[in-house]
Structures are given as C-alpha cells and as structure tokens.
C-alpha cells in the first residue's frame, strides 16, 4: 500500500466504487457526520467525506479520530460524538434483536463470485454473533441512481453557475457539458427527488 489511509469525497460513489474495484475498504459516513468544511462542493445535500483504507478497522479509526477533533473544536456533532470504536459499537449491537437485511440472490447476478463469497462470509459471521438475517426486496434501489443524478446535477449547476459564467476557462469541456445538464432540471423534479 502506498499510504495507510486516504480521504475522499463521495456524492454518488466516489469513495465506495474505486475502493471496491481495488480491494480496499471505502466508507461513506452518514451525511453531516464529518464536516465538509474546506471541501469544494458538488452537491450540498449529498457530499460527504470519508476514508479509503485497507480495512474497515482502519476506516473506523479515521472516523473516530476526526470526530474527536470536531468535538474538541466544538464543531456540531449531530451524533453526540463518536468517541468509542465504531466497530466495537457494531459488535455490541449484534444481538438476537438486531436484524440485518440481505438482498435476494437476483441482486447479486452481476457480482463476481469471489466478492459474493466474501459478502456472504461476513453475513454468516454476523449471524454467528447473534444477528437475525432476513431477505429484503431492493427493487426500489433501481431508482436510486436516477434520483442521485437529478439531485447532484441540479445542485452542482446551482453551485457552479457563477463560475461557469464568469470564468469557464477553469473547467474542462467534459465538466462543463455535465454541469449544464443541471440547468434543465425543473424545481418540481428536484424536490420530487428529495
């Protein structure tokens, strides 16, 4: 590994997808868990920062330390401060009362066998620790990407409109062609997507 941890921003998968392609762990914390202060925005309602690291434990340590720093600096912490290990908290939650939803086999039709095997291995581990595993229907997930695109494009255009008009030379043609798509998204479509 070139470095033990990297920090990225994730609006629609920019941490999670590259991580999964490279066999490392990418973690997108809950929205507003970590401050995005100093991050150049793309979508104010979806932008999140998070770690890319070798393991979930490494990601947990990163988030834990950032939360401690935010609390020490009196930044608003909507989750009352995470000062103990996220993984320890998760393990403590595993009980007969905890239910974990797992999609049906159809959901995994495009997933490589090795990835699928590791996923189900982790599910079996959680089951052995007391969690109840239930099958869930994630057909609605097919709408997630189009909804994300509407929100991201509308907010990105709104955020970048001033610079596109005043200093478009700082943008590549490819970026401009994506951003201007947001100009045609109606307020109704935007609010319906929220």
Where are the language model's segments positioned?
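A short helix-breaking turn/cap at a secondary-structure junction
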Residues: 28-117
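Active-site-proximal alpha-helical scaffold in enzymes
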Residues: 1-20, 52-56, 63
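Flexible, acidic loop-helix segments that line cofactor/substrate-binding pockets
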Residues: 74-83, 97-99, 103-106, 136-148, ...
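Acidic/polar loop patches that form or flank catalytic/metal-binding clefts of enzymes
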Residues: 5-8, 35, 71-78, 132-137
């Amino acid at each position: 590994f070139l470095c033990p941890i990297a920090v990225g921003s994730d609006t629609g998968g920019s941490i999670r997808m590259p991580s999964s392609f490279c066999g490392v762990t990418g973690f997108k914390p809950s929205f507003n868990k970590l401050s995005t202060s100093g991050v150049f925005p793309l979508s104010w309602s979806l932008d999140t920062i998070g770690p890319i690291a070798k393991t979930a434990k490494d990601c947990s340590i990163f988030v834990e330390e950032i939360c401690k720093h935010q609390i020490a600096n009196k930044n608003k912490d909507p989750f009352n401060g995470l000062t103990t290990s996220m993984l320890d908290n998760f393990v403590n939650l595993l009980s007969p009362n905890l239910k974990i939803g797992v999609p049906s086999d159809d959901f995994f039709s495009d997933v490589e066998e090795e990835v699928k095997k590791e996923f189900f291995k982790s599910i079996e581990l959680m089951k052995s620790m007391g969690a109840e595993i239930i099958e869930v229907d994630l057909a609605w997930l097919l709408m997630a990407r189009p909804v994300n695109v509407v929100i991201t494009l509308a907010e990105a255009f709104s955020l970048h409109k001033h610079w596109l008009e005043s200093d478009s030379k700082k943008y590549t043609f490819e970026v401009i062609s994506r951003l201007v798509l947001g100009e045609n998204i109606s307020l109704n479509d935007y609010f319906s997507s929220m």
